[in-house]
């Protein structure tokens, strides 16, 4: 749940950043209505119970209602949606919920019944949700990747400024504790 929480905290901060761009023609106070955070989890038996608890705390998951079969047919995935105003914070290596009053976040959670690997999850995202949501851009994160406070905005801006742009990627930096660079002379330089 630590990796998931770290990513979601970064995503939530990006949504707040876009809502605070009050002079923008595209973003501003109601920007959260233009953003849907889709979470795809690969396998109901594989998902970390603490991550499930975090998702339940955010309001986008209900434990105990998912079934393997309905009317004798195998279930492929379970889909939950919710607009949350609950935030997340990290305390050491654990994610925890915190009350949040400012920016709502629209969440869509797909819990695949079977573990079918990452590419299948991407296919779910693009073929199932992409068709329904019809987004202008999509930004993909693996759990554990922490976007900077305006990273998603900067990626959106690249597409907005160049409509023929088919793809973009952000910069990835290693996250180190304060002072850890000094232990490795290659990183310290």
UniProtKB/Swiss-Prot annotation:
It comes from Exophiala jeanselmei (Dematiaceous fungus). GO terms for cellular component: cell septum; plasma membrane. It is a multi-pass membrane protein. It is found in: Cell membrane. The keyword Zinc does not apply. Its EC number is 2.4.1.16. The lineage of its organism: Eukaryota, Fungi, Dikarya, Ascomycota, Pezizomycotina. This is Chitin synthase 1. Keywords: Cell membrane, Cell wall biogenesis/degradation, Glycosyltransferase, Membrane, Transferase, Transmembrane. Polymerizes chitin, a structural polymer of the cell wall and septum, by transferring the sugar moiety of UDP-GlcNAc to the non-reducing end of the growing chitin polymer. Pfam families: Chitin_synth_1.
């Amino acid at each position: 749940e630590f990796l998931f929480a770290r990513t979601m905290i970064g995503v939530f901060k990006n949504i707040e950043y876009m809502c605070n761009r009050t002079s923008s023609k595209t973003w501003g106070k109601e920007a959260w209505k233009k953003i849907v955070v889709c979470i795809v989890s690969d396998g109901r038996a594989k998902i970390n119970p603490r991550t499930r608890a975090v998702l339940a705390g955010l309001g986008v998951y209900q434990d105990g209602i998912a079934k393997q079969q309905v009317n004798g047919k195998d279930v492929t995935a379970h889909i939950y949606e919710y607009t949350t105003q609950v935030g997340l914070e990290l305390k050491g290596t654990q994610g925890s919920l915190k009350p949040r009053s400012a920016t709502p976040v629209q969440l869509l959670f797909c819990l695949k019944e079977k573990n079918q690997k990452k590419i299948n999850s991407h296919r779910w995202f693009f073929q199932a949700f992409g068709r329904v949501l019809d987004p202008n851009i999509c930004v993909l994160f693996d759990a554990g990747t922490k976007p900077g406070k305006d990273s998603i905005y900067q990626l959106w801006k690249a597409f907005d400024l160049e409509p023929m742009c088919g793809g973009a990627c952000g910069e990835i930096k290693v996250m180190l504790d304060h002072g850890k660079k000094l232990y490795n002379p290659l990183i310290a330089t």
